[in-house]
Structure formats: C-alpha cells, structure tokens
Amino acid sequence: MERRDFKEQLKKTAHLARLHLTPEEEELFAKQLQNILDYFKKLQELDTSNVEPMAHVLPLYNIWREDEVRESISQEEALKNAPEIEDLGFKIPRIMKREE
C-alpha cells in the first residue's frame, strides 16, 4: 500500500473511531503502523515448514473460570469521557437506516 493511501486509510479509521488527530499525530501513527506492517513482511519470509500448526502459542488447557462478581467502575466513571451520552449510555452515530 502506498504511503499516501495508507495515510488516507488511517484518517478514515480515526474518523470512524471518533479520534481527532493532529497532522503530526497522523504522520506519527502512519509511520508506526507502516513499521508494524514492514515487520509482518519480514515475518512472512521466515521458514516455518518444520513448525507444527497450533491454535494457541501457549499450551493452555481448561483456562475457563467461573464468573464472579467483583468491584468495577461506576456508570458515571465509565461515561465521563464519552463524547455523547443518551439514556445513561454511550451515544454512537447511526450506521444503518431504519426501514420506514
């Protein structure tokens, strides 16, 4: 992906996530993400023909636990940084049209 296209994709993603990025942040994040993608390209060059396929990196079995009630943050605390609140919950932009 070309750098210009990559920056446009980053802007779209930031907009969807309702992040307001400065041009400097856009440049910084685009560079960081490009470095990550470049690293993935390096990983694809590794010879893994002798590596057994696995579902998990660590051999963990029966990791599920019983649900338990624990202290958590209050609803007020959870919503304090929300850009918009409606009916004591997060208000998000509509992404689907209603059938009339």
UniProtKB/Swiss-Prot annotation:
Signal peptide: none annotated. Disulfide bonds: none annotated. One of its GO terms (molecular function) is asparaginyl-tRNA synthase (glutamine-hydrolyzing) activity. InterPro entries: Asp/Glu-ADT_sf_sub_c (IPR036113), GatC (IPR003837). It is an enzyme of class 6 (ligase). Pfam families: GatC. Keywords: ATP-binding, Ligase, Nucleotide-binding, Protein biosynthesis. SUPFAM superfamilies: Glu-tRNAGln amidotransferase C subunit. Its EC number is 6.3.5.-. GO terms for biological process: glutaminyl-tRNAGln biosynthesis via transamidation; regulation of translational fidelity; translation. It comes from the Bacteria. It catalyses: L-glutamyl-tRNA(Gln) + L-glutamine + ATP + H2O = L-glutaminyl-tRNA(Gln) + L-glutamate + ADP + phosphate + H(+); L-aspartyl-tRNA(Asn) + L-glutamine + ATP + H2O = L-asparaginyl-tRNA(Asn) + L-glutamate + ADP + phosphate + 2 H(+). Allows the formation of correctly charged Asn-tRNA(Asn) or Gln-tRNA(Gln) through the transamidation of misacylated Asp-tRNA(Asn) or Glu-tRNA(Gln) in organisms which lack either or both of asparaginyl-tRNA or glutaminyl-tRNA synthetases. The reaction takes place in the presence of glutamine and ATP through an activated phospho-Asp-tRNA(Asn) or phospho-Glu-tRNA(Gln). Heterotrimer of A, B and C subunits. Belongs to the GatC family. This is Aspartyl/glutamyl-tRNA(Asn/Gln) amidotransferase subunit C. It comes from Dictyoglomus thermophilum (strain ATCC 35947 / DSM 3960 / H-6-12). The gene is gatC.
